[in-house]
Amino acid sequence: MTASVKEGAHSEVLDKRRVNTKLGQKITANSLSSDANSSMNSKRLGLGIARRPGDNLLASISDNYGGKYEVSGENMTELPQPRGLFIHRNDRPISDDSIVTKNSELFSSGFSDDNNSGASSVETDELSSEGGINLGLNNLTVGPIASDEHNMDGSFISDNFEESFISTDSVSTLHIPNENRNHDKSFSYENGPQSRAHKMISTNTTSSTINANNMKSTGTLPPFRPRSNSYSSKHLGTSTLYDHSNSTSAILPNKQHYLTPSQRYRMRKERNDTSLRNSIRKKERFYDEQEPNMELQEGDIDDSLIWNIPMASFSTNSFLMSSGDPKHVRSHQSKPQPRFPQRHNFGSVPHFQPPLMSSALDFKAMPTSPVPGIDSTSDLQFIRETTENLSSVYLQSSNRLSRSKLLERTDSAEVLPIEFKEASEKGMEDLILVSEDKLDVVSHSRPSWLPPKDPEEKKLHENQISKSMSIASFEQLDRNKESEERHIQDETNRQKYVLLLDRGVTRNSSIQSLKKMIWETPLTVDTRWSIYDQLLQSDVRLISEQYIESFEQIMQVLNKMEFPRNKETEIEKLIDNSIKNKISGKQNISNDLLLMLQLKSISHQGLIPGDELLFHHFLTDPSTNQSLQHVWELVNLIQLTCFNDFTKEKYDIKIVEPRGVVSKYLSQDDSFKSEFNTSCLNSTTWWNILERVDHNLFMWIMDIIVVANSQCFKNYPINREKFKNKSWEYYKSKKVIVEYKVLASFALNVLLNYHFGFNDLISITTLEDKSFCIPMPLDNLFDEGYINNVFIRKWLHYYKKF
């Protein structure tokens, strides 16, 4: 016995210097054996002698107590080999201990370093006063605490056990309710190298015991609950752990034992695996809760398909354990259960362990996702059929959505803005691809096939466009209002023309009214011929009878003679240059134009500038009723009175007069220096302007010129006898007005406001553009009446300056 004590002391010294000490301790107590058996069992207890972790006393115990307290295999299962103790980390490594083994972090985990070294000491604890019931076992074996996650059959341990296992610094105290509150002995195990005290409290040996046979027959496990920082094993029995006080076994609780490297390795591995699995499951539950089902929110899936959701069916629980007891079905809301840290012993009372075939996971829960390096099973293996069904539903809904969108785009293509349709006709846009989002981005001020504008730029441009459109709208409203007023005014003036003609246009009051109204409204077709005739020669018509050759006579002369071919060619060329190649050529040219020019060429006055234009416009104007005689008389009358030699001469002088009105305006712009001369500004080039004037404006211009050359024949009548046998020069000096101002103001208006597309009044006749017109028509913006009215008002403005 003394040798054993010395040997144990020597072993204690060696344990402090050894890096990893092999733990092999087994305390066997049998209340039914004799003192000799107790002494023999005491000798079999480890006294600090190094032992292999694989040595198991199960065989020897089975030989001694085989079959005496057998445990039913239906409810109990054998625990695996011990892997490690619940230990505390030393603040400092023990001398000659392995620092690398304890701190090398072989398995990266938040729990890999916790309690990787330490020792377990067996101490007695007084727990009888705490309400805990000590259970006296026939045979009590204290050894390395198993921390394996799996049972021997490979089934999973519940999370409740894992959670209890993670808290390694505290081992729960087991409380077993029983009718008998008396205790023999209680043992308390506290981890840590500083814990070396062992206390043993002897209790009444006659206390009531738990019959092992009763435990065997019932096969049920008493309930238990965890406690922190200590683990107490309370047993009910009639015999103590040590039958002899002088036994060397009494000093065993004072012995300090450490975990071996393999035990620490297994413990760290189990902690890493447990932590990793818990983390994976928590993340899976989190993402399953956070992931929304957008397709169901769209309402595109029928209610009959709602059942087809990706979840595990009953066929996917092959990897789970069948639950024989519904009480042990795993639930996240259930109360955590501790892992019972006791190795199975056939000779002891059954320890508290989940029964065989108990389920650690809920078979209704989703299967865990595969973990790289741990599980090689694919998660798609369990939901393959479900994913195929969902894929078909998604494809079907996608096709249905595509068809509906295509039909919607096709219908909306008919009501798209005009710019998209124009771009589609040019091949620059596909109407089916135009969505509502594109309509919001595309700007009307930029083609749709170009990159869209910046939002701020688009907003700025739209504001400017809106402002311009507003101004244009107001202007258009003003023009519309003005057009209505002008239309009313024209109707009123036309009625006044008729009244004035009935009353007599040669009266002074009538002439003043005419000179005012003619700038507002042109003469009507019905009144033009009569007013021209009365204003230029009064009712006496002395000029037509005495100074204009009769149309019948000149016609007879032309019929009797053979008109020279070269003269005829010159007349045709004149028609082409002055009429056909100009804006007037757009109208129908009368077949009698050549005849009228031939007659004029053989007359006493001959062809003079402007004859071709006057004949052409009067032949096409309904006011003359296409009467050749009326046209003949009217053209000659205008040439003799309005464009006589005195008027032309006066115009040629005043148009280039250095101190005149025209010079005053043109001298303000240096660009008119090359144009302000007699070669460019004369009575002949004046007619070049009229070649570029359309018919309606030409007739209005003639109306103004005729009214400007009118006389008050009512107060100063023409005496036929006075001018009988008098020459035209005499009559002209007495009864013809020289009115050059209206002609000069007309030319000044064109030079200042309509000098576009030509260099001077000479080159204007040589322009090849047949459609060139003064003023230029703007059919898309303004009507012809408005443009002509603006031209006349500007002309009136300059006419008043003379």
Curated annotation (Swiss-Prot):
Is Cytoplasm among the key words of this record?
yes
Keywords from UniProt, A to Z, are: Cell wall biogenesis/degradation, Cytoplasm, Golgi apparatus, Protein transport, Transport
Keyword field contains Protein transport: yes
Q: Name one GO cellular component term.
A: Golgi apparatus
Q: Which GO terms describe its biological process?
A: fungal-type cell wall organization; protein transport
Cellular localisation: Cytoplasm; Golgi apparatus
Region feature Disordered, mapped onto this chain: 207-230, 323-345
| Recorded coiled-coil stretches | none
Task: Fetch the Pfam families from UniProt.
Answer: SBE2_C, SBE2_M, SBE2_N
Q: Which family does it belong to?
A: Belongs to the SBE2 family.
Function text: With SBE2, is involved in cell wall integrity and polarity processes like bud growth.
**What's the protein name?**
Protein SBE22
Q: Which organism is it from?
A: Vanderwaltozyma polyspora (strain ATCC 22028 / DSM 70294 / BCRC 21397 / CBS 2163 / NBRC 10782 / NRRL Y-8283 / UCD 57-17) (Kluyveromyces polysporus)
